[in-house]
Amino acid sequence: MQISFIGAGKVGVSLGKYFISKGRKVGGYYSLSPESAAWAANFTNTKQYQSIKEIISSSDMIFFTVPDDKIGEVWETAKPYAHGKIIAHCSGIHSSNIFSDIDRTGSMAYSIHPLCAVSDRKTSWQALGDVLFTIEGDERNISNIQNMFAQMGNRTCFISAENKIKYHAAASLASNHMTAVFFMAQKLFLECGFSMQQANEELYRLAKGNLENIHAQGCINSLTGPVERGDKNTVQKHMDALDADMKNAYLENAKLLLEIAEQKNPDRDYAAMREILMPTESGEQCEK
């Protein structure tokens, strides 16, 4: 089976390079940017296709590795040539339903999402061997798609079209939103006189240790800190020291920490903490 890519960005190039490293046959790339397609073809030692018609007719499976908001548009251009093919995209949020009227072409559609951050065209492929791929799409061939990745050593998971958005939100929280939390902590360290290098290194060590605990014990058993202890005075001092934007972010996260704390310590009284984090409308803290 020959696999090719419409779109020559980070995801398409990384997948192509990875597939080749695992012995898969990759035809090459087509892109509206000839320079990008040429670079991708050279990097993977494959072909640069000159048109959508050419790449589809030469391939058995075609990945649409274009920006999420362009998948449907590019599919409309490709649809007249897609007869009896396997069509896929790598969007986390979109399902295979974005390939409209695909049944009329005799092709089968899939969304195949690598659960990882693909940040570099040259190097990200090297980490794909330890990545989970979530698969959604036409059930007639889905077991073969799963086997394709299993044979390369990847973990796979089926997901329904209805759950794609919630799944992608979860992935964004664990990846992108964690960056935002780290960024806030970094800013505070810099305000305290740490150098950027110190802030990066020491906060990384702290975050890494916590992630390792979560991986080993789960969120509930890993929770520590002032919210878990019920230390309302410390939490209040934290919020008093923050500007409005950071305070709001801290507060929303602390509410979730309180939910975890109450599960960890069901016999502990968190009423005072709850009043700080979620004061009643008539309370003094809610007055403007």
What are these regions (language model features)?
Residues 1-54, 58:
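NAD(P)+-binding Rossmann beta1-loop-alpha1 motif at the extreme N-terminus of oxidoreductases
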Residues 27-31, 87-90, 135-136:
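Short, hydrophobic beta-strand segments that form beta-sheet elements in well-ordered domains
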Residues 35-43, 106, 124-215, 272, ...:
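Internal alpha-helical scaffold of NAD(P)-dependent oxidoreductase catalytic cores
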Residues 44-123:
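Rossmann-like NAD(P)(H) cofactor-binding subdomain of soluble oxidoreductases
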Residues 212-267:
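Interdomain hinge/lid region at the active-site interface
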